[in-house]
Amino acid sequence: MAVNNISKKRKFVGDGVFKAELNEFLTRELAEDGYSGVEVRVTPTRSEIIIMATRTQSVLGEKGRRIRELTSVVQKRFNIPEQSVELYAEKVATRGLCAIAQAESLRYKLIGGLAVRRACYGVLRFIMESGARGCEVVVSGKLRGQRAKSMKFVDGLMIHSGDPCNDYVNTATRHVLLRQGVLGIKVKIMLPWDQQGKNGPKKPQPDHILVTEPKDEPAPLEPTSDIRSLAPAPLPQPVAAVA
C-alpha cells in the first residue's frame, strides 16, 4: 500500500485552507444562531469540530437533527469518511467579549432599521458592561446621502501595535446590505487580563505592574537594635594601695 508523504508546509497550508472554508460555510449557515467561531481538534481516531455560538440549542436543533445535517454536509463537502468527524456545539462564555457575536448583533440591528448612532452606542455600552478594557466600533458606507463616510465609536483603552495585540484584541468584520447600499462593520474589543484564562488571556501585558501586599512581620518578643557596634571594652580593675 502506497503512503502519501506530505511535507509539513503543504500540511499546514491544507489545514489552514480547510479551517478557512469551514469557517466561511458555518458563518453563512449559522449567522442567525450567534455563530462566534470554530475550533478543529485532531485526534488519532477522529477529528472534532467545536462550533462556538451564543444560541447552542438552535445549532443542535430538535433532537440533534440540525447538527447531524451539518455533519453530513461537512463530510460530503470536504470528502471526509463517515464516523471520522464529529461536530459539537459550545456556548460562548461571555457574549459581550466576543467581537463576532457583537458584529452580528449590530448587523441585525441595522437591518431592523435602528439608527446607526443608537445601535453603535448600544453595542458599545454592552461590551463595556461585560468587563472589556476597551472597544472600538467603525461603521462605513452611505450612512446619510449619496456620499460615503465612516463613523467611529471608541470607549476605554485600546492598543494598536505590538505582539500583545494578537492576544488581547478581538476583531471582527461584517457587511450588511441596506437599501442605500452596503455598509461595513468593524468591531475591536480589548480583552481583560484573566489569570484563569476564561474571559481573557492568562499572559499579562509587558507594561503591567503587579503590586503585592507586604507580609505581616511577627512582633518582637525582646527589644533588639539594628545598630551593630563593637563589643564594649572591659572596665579597668581597681589597684590595691601599698602601705
From Swiss-Prot:
Region of interest (Disordered), ranges: 195-243
GO terms under biological process: positive regulation of apoptotic signaling pathway; translation
Segments forming a coiled coil: none
Occurrences of domain KH type-2 (ranges): 22-93
Cellular-component GO terms for this entry: cytosolic small ribosomal subunit; nucleus
Keywords for this protein: Ribonucleoprotein, Ribosomal protein, RNA-binding
Keyword Transmembrane helix: no
Domain of life: Eukaryota
Gene Ontology terms, MF aspect: RNA binding; structural constituent of ribosome
InterPro entries associated with the record: KH_dom-like_a/b (IPR015946), KH_dom_type_2 (IPR004044), KH_sf_prok-type (IPR009019), Ribosomal_S3_C_sf (IPR036419), Ribosomal_uS3_C (IPR001351), Ribosomal_uS3_CS (IPR018280), Ribosomal_uS3_euk/arc (IPR005703)
One Pfam assignment: Ribosomal_S3_C
Similarity annotation: Belongs to the universal ribosomal protein uS3 family.
Protein name: Small ribosomal subunit protein uS3
UniProt organism field: Manduca sexta
Name of the gene encoding the protein in the UniProt record: RpS3
